[in-house]
């Protein structure tokens, strides 16, 4: 379950950002999850709660935005938006795609007091 390691990394980033900005308690966190990140949303919520235990983010509300992946098509030389690994280029139908974005998880923003 790689969700736990992703959430541990996110919790580290949240702690660092809260410290830098003088936030004593994080109330909300927004994560951007790429469509190809291979994470289960319910597992992400569960692991996030574990990763944030005993931190400034404990008990915060987690918001997850799934973002489409971007790929470069080798055959028609165009960018394409895809939602799965086995995607085809919507422009030419080619399967020769190179993923350029959307296979990661990012801390988009956080709110606190």
From Swiss-Prot:
Signal peptide: none
Coiled-coil residue windows: none
Keywords tagged on the record: Metal-binding, Nickel, Zinc
Pfam families membership: HypA
Residues the record lists as binding Zn(2+): 73, 76, 89, 92
General function of this protein: Involved in the maturation of [NiFe] hydrogenases. Required for nickel insertion into the metal center of the hydrogenase.
NCBIfam families linked to this entry: hypA, PRK12380.1
The name this protein goes by in its record: Hydrogenase maturation factor HybF
Organism from which the protein derives: Klebsiella pneumoniae
Classification lineage: Bacteria, Pseudomonadati, Pseudomonadota, Gammaproteobacteria, Enterobacterales
């Amino acid at each position: 379950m790689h969700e736990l390691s992703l959430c541990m990394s996110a919790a580290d980033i949240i702690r660092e950002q809260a410290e830098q900005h003088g936030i004593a308690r994080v109330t909300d966190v927004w994560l951007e999850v790429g469509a190809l990140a291979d994470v289960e949303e319910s597992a992400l919520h569960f692991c996030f709660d574990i990763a944030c235990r005993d931190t400034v983010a404990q008990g915060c509300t987690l918001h997850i935005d799934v973002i489409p992946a971007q790929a470069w098509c080798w055959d028609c030389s165009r960018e394409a938006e895809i939602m799965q690994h086995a995607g085809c280029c919507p422009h030419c139908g080619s399967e020769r795609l190179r993923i350029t974005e959307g296979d990661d998880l990012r801390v988009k923003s956080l709110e606190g007091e």
